[in-house]
């Protein structure tokens, strides 16, 4: 057992082990989670690697080669969206949109809110942060919820926008929409009412722990929306509707289906921007200025992404690692996609270029532990990372030397950059995340080689670290926060704060939901779904539903951080943590979007995040 000193010694899994323990989570909100590794009796650990004639028989996951070649990535061009002409037109459109927001919409409160929502949905709000905050602060201060003309739609929309921007709005405002006799939300199924129900559904996902009204709103709105979809689908006899099938009647059904698939709050903004722009263009009431502005901004930002990707691709090609190690997942494009999900702002190029390297190394080293390495080799690699000395390479098998050397150099280079910009040496924090990652990966390797089946608690205590969430978020903090604060550093000295734990746990559970079947087929250790099934005797579908329920509860814990006035972390970092949860749900929504190279994976990368295709 290895734990941080000075931290309460409890299992961080009390909130997710079963539904009866969820209420205990609130008592842990101010603590940091110690790093725990559930140890198996050493007498049960054996090395199942078989050696014949001095040749080690290794496992293979038979990963497919990458879809996206080096030459293809380097050929990407967005030259038509660079230069003074585009910049000048963008500035002109920005001024026009600002006038619409501040002048034309000023007298119509609801229209102004809808326009702000449109800016957020099309990933344009970052250009109007000051103006949006001024408008929302004014609306919050005058309590416009008292407006008798506010219906469910207007109330839910304003509630969502205010909560999204950190305002403490009471859930009590929705009580007026409950039935006076039953105290339940009134049933609404007409086309006009369904707009309000959809708005209530989206607002409910901003709920925090113990906010029962918002939980009731979620349950009620889901039931109502599902009934609406069933009735509309039966009436129209159209089992599925695509964006290309757009007309006024189909628009609401399309929006409802999209929302039920995954709420807006849980989606990554880049993919949603493309989806909404495509839909908005077909809207007969669309604003042509906003549409042109959204398209041009989108394509210009995409050109920045492509340069970042090409930079990362050249680094990867220079390492020659993809040529020398054929047993692991060569997934440069997918690794880059994670960085866009964490920080999509155009000015965050440094993060995408440097942290993309970390995602490549995480994937490579994960495959060494999961697939290729023997137990003895993995222990050597773990010890080398803990020593953090290039001389440790002498003790490693040849195939491990280059990954270790790349890791050592990359972390030290990133630490050097932080030292130069902030006069703070963070290498010990970055190193610690990698030591923890490797030790927890080693524990899973020991389980595999011994044939041990962990309990759900044993597995999840280990797996929220082995999934690499702490690596990703510790790096994001130091790469994207300037300046780092003394209070934050003091907290990080103790261990991983709740926001890192909760986001990492969502990453773990979404990963398992998307990948566990494939991993079980190749003989990996049981994942969260299988461990829960073994512990409780439930079916796979029931276990999957439980994991989805836990994800929902973890999101509530994340939402609590928005009102934690004692948090030393910036809103930017809290947003990065939320974005890790969002990009993980995007990647694993339809299976293993990180490892798989099927047509669906290719489509989601090329069309949704639109690193490849312009609008």
UniProtKB/Swiss-Prot annotation:
Matching InterPro entries: Isoprenoid_synthase_dom_sf, Terpene_cyclase-like_1_C, Terpene_cyclase_plant_C1, Terpene_synth_N, Terpene_synth_N_sf, Terpene_synthase-like, Terpene_synthase_metal-bd, Terpenoid_cyclase/PrenylTrfase
Binding site for Mg(2+) 3: 516, 520, 524
Binding residue positions for (2E)-geranyl diphosphate: 334, 371, 375, 513, 516
Transit peptide segment: 1-33
Gene3D superfamilies given in the database record: Farnesyl Diphosphate Synthase, Terpene synthase, N-terminal domain
Motif, DDXXD motif: chain positions: 371-375
Domain of life: Eukaryota
Binding site for Mg(2+) 1: 371, 375
Presence of keyword Plastid: yes
Main location per the UniProt record: plastid
Pathway field: Secondary metabolite biosynthesis; terpenoid biosynthesis
EC numbers for this chain: 4.2.3.115, 4.2.3.114
Catalytic activity: (2E)-geranyl diphosphate = alpha-terpinene + diphosphate; (2E)-geranyl diphosphate = gamma-terpinene + diphosphate
Localization terms from the record: Plastid, Chloroplast
Co-factor binding details: Binds 3 Mg(2+) or Mn(2+) ions per subunit.
Presence of the UniProt keyword Ribosomal protein in the record: no
A GO cellular component entry from the record: chloroplast
Gene Ontology terms: biological process: diterpenoid biosynthetic process
GO MF annotation, one: terpene synthase activity
A Pfam family reported for this protein in Swiss-Prot or TrEMBL: Terpene_synth
Cofactors that this protein relies on: Mg(2+); Mn(2+)
Binding positions (Mg(2+) 2): 371, 375
Family: Belongs to the terpene synthase family. Tpsb subfamily.
Domain commentary: The Asp-Asp-Xaa-Xaa-Asp/Glu (DDXXD/E) motif is important for the catalytic activity, presumably through binding to Mg(2+).
Function as written in the Swiss-Prot or TrEMBL entry: Involved in monoterpene (C10) olefins biosynthesis, constituants of cannabinoids and terpenoids-rich resins. Catalyzes mainly the conversion of (2E)-geranyl diphosphate to alpha-terpinene and gamma-terpinene.
Official protein name in the record: Alpha-terpinene synthase TPS33PK, chloroplastic
Organism of origin: Cannabis sativa
Chain's gene name: TPS33PK
């Amino acid at each position: 057992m290895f734990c941080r000193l000075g931290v309460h010694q409890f299992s961080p899994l009390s909130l997710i082990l079963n539904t009866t323990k969820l209420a205990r989570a609130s008592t842990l909100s101010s603590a940091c989670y110690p790093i725990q590794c559930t140890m198996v009796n050493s007498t049960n650990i054996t090395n199942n690697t078989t050696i014949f004639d001095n040749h080690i028989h290794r496992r293979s996951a038979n990963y497919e080669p990458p879809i996206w070649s080096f030459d293809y990535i380097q050929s990407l061009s967005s030259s038509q969206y660079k230069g003074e002409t585009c910049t000048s037109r963008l500035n002109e459109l920005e001024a026009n949109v600002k006038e619409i927001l501040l002048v034309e919409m000023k007298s119509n409160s609801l229209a102004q809110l809808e326009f702000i929502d449109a800016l957020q949905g099309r990933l344009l709000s970052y250009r109007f942060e000051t103006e949006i905050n001024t408008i929302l602060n004014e609306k919050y201060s005058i309590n416009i919820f008292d407006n008798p003309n506010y219906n469910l739609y207007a109330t839910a929309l304003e509630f969502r926008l205010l909560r999204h921007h950190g305002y403490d709005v009471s859930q009590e405002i929705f009580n007026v929409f409950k039935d006076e006799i039953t105290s339940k939300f009134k049933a609404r199924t007409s086309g006009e009412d369904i707009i309000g129900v959809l708005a209530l559904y989206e607002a409910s996902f901003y709920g925090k722990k113990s906010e029962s009204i918002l939980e009731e709103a979620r349950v009620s709105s889901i039931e109502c929306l599902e009934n609406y979809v069933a009735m509309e689908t039966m009436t129209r006899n159209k089992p599925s509707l695509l964006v290309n099938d757009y007309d006024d009647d189909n628009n609401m059904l399309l929006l409802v289906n999209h929302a039920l698939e995954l709420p807006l709050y849980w989606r990554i903004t880049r993919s949603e921007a493309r989806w909404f722009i495509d839909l908005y263009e077909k809207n007969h009431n669309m604003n042509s200025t906003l549409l042109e502005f959204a398209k041009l901004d989108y394509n210009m930002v995409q050109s920045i992404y492509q340069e970042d990707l090409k930079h990362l691709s050249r680094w990867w090609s220079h390492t020659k690692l993809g040529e020398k190690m054929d047993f692991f997942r060569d997934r440069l494009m997918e690794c880059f996609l994670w960085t866009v999900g964490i920080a999509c702002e155009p000015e965050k190029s440094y993060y995408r270029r440097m942290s993309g390297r970390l995602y490549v190394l995480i994937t490579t080293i994960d495959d060494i532990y999961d697939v290729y390495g023997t137990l003895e080799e993995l222990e050597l690699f773990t010890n080398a990372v803990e020593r953090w000395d290039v001389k440790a390479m002498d003790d490693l098998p040849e195939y491990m030397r280059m990954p270790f050397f790349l890791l050592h150099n990359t972390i030290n280079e990133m630490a050097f950059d932080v030292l130069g910009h902030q006069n703070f040496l963070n290498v010990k924090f970055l190193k610690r995340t990698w030591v923890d990652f490797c030790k927890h990966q080693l524990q899973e390797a020991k389980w595999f080689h011994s044939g041990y089946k962990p309990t759900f608690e044993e597995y999840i205590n280990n797996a929220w670290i082995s999934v690499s969430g702490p690596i990703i978020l510790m790096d994001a903090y130091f790469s994207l926060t300037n300046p780092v604060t003394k209070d934050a550093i003091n907290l990080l000295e103790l261990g991983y704060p709740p926001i890192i734990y909760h986001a990492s746990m969502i990453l773990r559970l979404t990963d398992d939901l998307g990948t566990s079947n494939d991993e079980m087929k190749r003989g990996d250790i049981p994942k969260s779904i299988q461990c829960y099934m073994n512990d409780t005797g439930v079916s796979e579908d029931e276990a999957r539903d439980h994991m989805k329920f836990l994800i929902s509860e973890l999101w509530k814990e994340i939402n609590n951080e928005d009102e934690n006035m004692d948090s030393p972390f910036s809103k930017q970092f809290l947003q990065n943590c939320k974005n890790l949860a969002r990009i993980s749900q995007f990647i694993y929504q339809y299976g293993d979007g990180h490892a798989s190279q099927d047509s669906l994976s290719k489509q989601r990368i090329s069309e949704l995040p639109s690193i490849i295709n312009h609008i």
